[in-house]
Structures are given as C-alpha cells and as structure tokens.
C-alpha cells in the first residue's frame, strides 16, 4: 500500500486551523472543505484519462477527461464534510454512503447505514473520512466495499494516527493508497488521536444524537 503524506504549505495552514481548539464550527468547516479539495486533488493524480478533440474559439485542441470517474464514499458522519470538496474536483463522480458511529465505551465502530452499488469491481473508489484513529471504522468500511467487489480503493484521511495506519497496512485488505495530511504519533486513553483535532463530526456539526445501545 502506498502512503502519501501531502506536505504543502496550504495543507499545513488549513490543518493548523482545524487543529486549533478556538476554531468554531464555521471556521472548522471551511478549513475542512479547503483541505478536502487539496487531498482529493492528490488522490486523483493517477486516475486514467482518455483524450478527445475539443473545439476552441480558434481551432482544435486535444482534450482530456476521466475515463472511469471514481465513486466517492464518505464514512458518515464526519465524512459528509468531504463530499462537496470531492465533487468540486471530480463533478462526474458518483457518491455512496457508509454510516458508522463510534461506541464511546468500546471504541469500536457501530454500523447504521450502507448505500453502495451492488458491483464495484473495476470501479475506482475513494473512501473519505477526516480521521484515521484506531483504524476500526476505516477497516470496517473497506470490508464492506470489498464485499461489493471493490478492488481499487484509495483512502483519503486528513489526520491519521500511526496505530491506525499500521493496522490498515497489516490488514491484508486491497487498499491501494492512503492519502493524508499528517500522521500523528499516538492515541490517548480514549482512543482519540493525539494531538489530533478532537471529534471531527462534533466540530463540523455539533454533538451527535445517536443512541448506539438501542441498535
């Protein structure tokens, strides 16, 4: 699996805004949108293109378009914030959804939604989630994609923790690439990324209201 840490001044600047505890929901959301577009740009640099003739106001030029646009799959809830940035870069992409919430007692992912095409074989998939912490949610989502035949998976995460990256690398799952803005060294006692940026879903949308024990 290829791991790409995007080291760019604008990436570092937006990431700093997201890390800052003083950033309110609006500021955090705007920074996430900018950073999301930058990471999708990096993640898409090896998508296959096809050429065609395009008429300019002067003559004919060679044009290019994606031969097989990817499907963008956010892990709900925080991943929802990455849909618009992804579509701004790849407007002809499809969108699927995987809903996973973290059980705060066990730190394990609890699935509650799946909306994916029946057959993803031969289809580039970009699995997007701002955080890769323990790796539990991401691996759960990758396994769902594989069950639907996915064989070309790129994970796009803004902040990754080394334990989660190691878990993904050692999973044996067919993830081709991880694109991230940073790899933080550790998790705290509550399995949050340290230093991280807190709960991305809460900082985007406010505290969640999902009763996991009733599911």
From Swiss-Prot:
Binds 1 Mg(2+) ion per subunit. The magnesium is bound as Mg-PRPP. One of its GO terms (molecular function) is GTP binding. GO terms for biological process: UMP salvage; uracil salvage. It comes from the Bacteria. Coiled coil: none annotated. Transmembrane segments: none annotated. Keywords: Allosteric enzyme, Glycosyltransferase, GTP-binding, Magnesium, Nucleotide-binding, Transferase. It catalyses: UMP + diphosphate = 5-phospho-alpha-D-ribose 1-diphosphate + uracil. 5-phospho-alpha-D-ribose 1-diphosphate binds at residues 77, 102, 129-137, 199. It holds the Pfam family UPRTase. Its EC number is 2.4.2.9. Uracil binds at residues 193, 198-200. Its cofactor is Mg(2+). The keyword Magnesium applies. Pathway: Pyrimidine metabolism; UMP biosynthesis via salvage pathway; UMP from uracil: step 1/1. Allosterically activated by GTP. Catalyzes the conversion of uracil and 5-phospho-alpha-D-ribose 1-diphosphate (PRPP) to UMP and diphosphate. Belongs to the UPRTase family. NCBIfam families: PRK00129.1, upp. This is Uracil phosphoribosyltransferase. It comes from Corynebacterium urealyticum (strain ATCC 43042 / DSM 7109).
